[in-house]
Design a protein with these regions (language model features):
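A compositional/structural signature for long, glycine/proline-rich flexible linkers
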Residues: 4-304
């Protein structure tokens, strides 16, 4: 997004949303191509990852103001825009497309030849985010090595990618995750200038299941203590099982599991997901650099 300077130190930005498919010949800054789907509906998601400390959830920028330009050039704002766009209409996207339907999920976790901890592994097994077929492949073992990236839920994109693992408390009440942390600019306290870093932002989240896609909680990069060698240690458990030394003062961060597990059928299930946002071009260990499942450990090395 290209920004223009307004009054004082305020930057203004304008994004044009078009009901068109992008083509390889189009490379226009500040254009978002959002073709309609069922019943001529379009869906736009405005995401803010982390505002600075003591700043409101918009990052101090307020919500963007929509302006609707009609075919005759007339521009509508405010309530008129909402009425014409019918912004209160029900979402036409099938929720089955956003997650796994409950009946299918129950079948996947109850396969007759699998243990009651399935598909959790001990030690945990990590998966990159591929297409929907490979999402189901976490349960069936059938992952297409040539599947495309940046699909399969949780809104990945060119700048934001995940790796994930499914856990089960029947393997143990506490999981310790240790790895090397990508460097990030320390801006949470309001620092305006940023130093060079591996990624813009990274986080580790715990989720319930791919049925309800509910997030339990997340840790972002500046919340996680890093040792002198650049490594983090994170304990993951229910509140009741939290180790006494899982506090920042002891160099161990803590991430909670939900008390009701996957929120559906198994109280012991949790999904954890690492996110890398906007990696530097020269950072060779980012999630974005992993194109195939079998490359994961080789590419990420100590960072996973």
């Amino acid at each position: 997004v290209v920004r223009s300077r307004g009054l004082g130190d305020v930057y203004k930005r304008q994004i044009n949303v078009l009901n068109e498919n992008p083509t390889t010949s189009q490379n226009n800054d500040n254009y978002l191509y959002t073709p309609e789907y069922r019943k001529r509906q379009q869906l736009i998601v405005y995401r803010i990852y982390l505002p600075d400390q003591n700043i409101d959830i918009t990052g101090g920028a307020k919500l963007p103001q929509p302006v609707l330009t009609l075919s005759n050039g007339t521009k509508l704002r405010g309530k008129q825009t909402c009425e014409i766009l019918n912004t209160s209409q029900p979402l036409q996207v099938s929720f089955d497309a956003l997650g796994i339907p409950p009946n299918e999920y129950r079948r996947l976790i109850s396969q007759p030849d699998k243990p009651d901890t399935w598909p959790a592994h001990n030690p945990p097994k990590w998966f990159i985010q591929l297409d929907r077929k490979s999402l189901i492949g976490m349960y069936t073992g059938k992952i297409d090595p040539n599947a495309p990236r940046s699909e399969g839920g949780f809104y990945p994109n060119l700048d934001n990618q995940y790796i994930r693992s499914i856990l089960n408390r029947k393997h143990g009440k506490v999981l310790i995750v240790r790895g090397k942390a990508p460097t990030t600019a320390k801006t949470y306290s309001g620092t305006s200038s940023t130093e060079e870093s591996n990624v813009r932002y990274w986080s580790l989240c715990s989720n319930q299941s791919f049925v309800n896609t509910r997030v339990n909680d997340c840790l972002f990069d500046e919340e996680v203590p890093i040792d002198k060698n650049g490594f983090y240690t994170i304990a993951i458990s229910r509140v009741e099982d939290r180790p006494r030394n899982a506090v920042n003062e002891c160099g161990i961060a803590w991430l909670p599991m939900a008390d009701d597990g996957d929120g559906m059928f198994d109280d012991d299930v949790t999904i954890i997901q690492f996110r890398h946002l906007l990696p530097a071009d020269n950072f060779e260990h980012s999630i974005q650099k992993v194109e195939r499942q079998d490359q994961l450990r080789k590419v990420m090395g100590p960072y996973m």
